[in-house]
């Protein structure tokens, strides 16, 4: 796939403006193509980042810690790959280490990388969990994402208070219900 130039991308924005009945040469829209491209570069910056690079910094001196570690309430905004409309919500991550841990900010960075791509919530849930599982090789990973989807509120069925929840478990969380319950009870108290 050949990546379009910045000028080609700006022309595509002008084409979309004409498609919806706007005049891209009117004063209020003259700089819009450039602004859209700048915002897309920021919004979709996850494509230029490698999650495994973030997960390379591990700590092996865990004092034999083999209990639940969680980071709750990680806010995100992403864009659905079907309509390129935003969906935003909260991610809760937990894992039980085997012999290493990562810095707490790394979990939030993982969410940032995957949410700054065209996504569907189900795929993002799996990607976050599997990247942690692959890198840290913990006893298990648990993820819950709750999100509001603009493609449900701005178009189609027009339901603006619907929340979509996805959960994904690996290892001990997938195998033993008691660990899933511990995770869900832990985040329910939030």
Swiss-Prot record:
<keyword id="KW-0554">One-carbon metabolism</keyword>
<keyword id="KW-0342">GTP-binding</keyword>
<dbReference type="InterPro" id="IPR018234">
    <property type="entry name" value="GTP_CycHdrlase_I_CS"/>
</dbReference>
<comment type="subunit">
    <text>Toroid-shaped homodecamer, composed of two pentamers of five dimers.</text>
</comment>
<keyword id="KW-0479">Metal-binding</keyword>
<dbReference type="GO" id="GO:0008270">
    <property type="term" value="F:zinc ion binding"/>
</dbReference>
<dbReference type="GO" id="GO:0003934">
    <property type="term" value="F:GTP cyclohydrolase I activity"/>
</dbReference>
<dbReference type="InterPro" id="IPR001474">
    <property type="entry name" value="GTP_CycHdrlase_I"/>
</dbReference>
<feature type="binding site">
    <location>
        <position position="80"/>
    </location>
    <ligand>
        <name>Zn(2+)</name>
    </ligand>
</feature>
<keyword id="KW-0378">Hydrolase</keyword>
<comment type="similarity">
    <text>Belongs to the GTP cyclohydrolase I family.</text>
</comment>
<dbReference type="GO" id="GO:0046654">
    <property type="term" value="P:tetrahydrofolate biosynthetic process"/>
</dbReference>
<keyword id="KW-0862">Zinc</keyword>
<feature type="binding site">
    <location>
        <position position="83"/>
    </location>
    <ligand>
        <name>Zn(2+)</name>
    </ligand>
</feature>
<dbReference type="GO" id="GO:0005737">
    <property type="term" value="C:cytoplasm"/>
</dbReference>
<keyword id="KW-0547">Nucleotide-binding</keyword>
<dbReference type="GO" id="GO:0006730">
    <property type="term" value="P:one-carbon metabolic process"/>
</dbReference>
<dbReference type="InterPro" id="IPR020602">
    <property type="entry name" value="GTP_CycHdrlase_I_dom"/>
</dbReference>
<feature type="binding site">
    <location>
        <position position="151"/>
    </location>
    <ligand>
        <name>Zn(2+)</name>
    </ligand>
</feature>
<dbReference type="InterPro" id="IPR043133">
    <property type="entry name" value="GTP-CH-I_C/QueF"/>
</dbReference>
<dbReference type="GO" id="GO:0006729">
    <property type="term" value="P:tetrahydrobiopterin biosynthetic process"/>
</dbReference>
<dbReference type="Pfam" id="PF01227">
    <property type="entry name" value="GTP_cyclohydroI"/>
</dbReference>
<comment type="pathway">
    <text>Cofactor biosynthesis; 7,8-dihydroneopterin triphosphate biosynthesis; 7,8-dihydroneopterin triphosphate from GTP: step 1/1.</text>
</comment>
<dbReference type="InterPro" id="IPR043134">
    <property type="entry name" value="GTP-CH-I_N"/>
</dbReference>
<dbReference type="GO" id="GO:0005525">
    <property type="term" value="F:GTP binding"/>
</dbReference>
<protein>
    <recommendedName>
        <fullName>GTP cyclohydrolase 1</fullName>
        <ecNumber>3.5.4.16</ecNumber>
    </recommendedName>
</protein>
């Amino acid at each position: 796939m050949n990546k379009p130039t910045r000028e080609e991308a700006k022309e595509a924005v002008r084409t979309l403006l004409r498609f919806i009945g706007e005049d891209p040469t009117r004063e209020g829209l003259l700089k819009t193509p450039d602004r859209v491209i700048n915002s897309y570069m920021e919004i979709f910056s996850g494509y230029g980042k490698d999650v495994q690079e973030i997960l390379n910094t591990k700590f092996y001196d865990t004092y034999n810690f083999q209990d639940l570690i969680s980071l709750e309430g990680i806010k995100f905004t992403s864009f659905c790959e079907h309509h390129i409309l935003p969906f935003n919500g909260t991610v809760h991550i937990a894992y039980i280490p085997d012999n290493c841990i990562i810095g707490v900010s790394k979990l939030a960075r993982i969410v940032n990388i995957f949410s700054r791509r065209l996504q569907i919530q189900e795929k993002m849930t799996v990607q976050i969990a599997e990247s942690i599982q692959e890198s840290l090789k913990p006893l298990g990973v648990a993820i819950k994402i709750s999100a509001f989807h603009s493609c449900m509120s701005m178009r189609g069925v027009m339901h603006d208070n619907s929340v979509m929840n996805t959960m994904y478990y690996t290892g001990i969380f997938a195998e033993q219900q008691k660990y899933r319950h511990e995770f869900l009870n832990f985040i329910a108290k939030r």
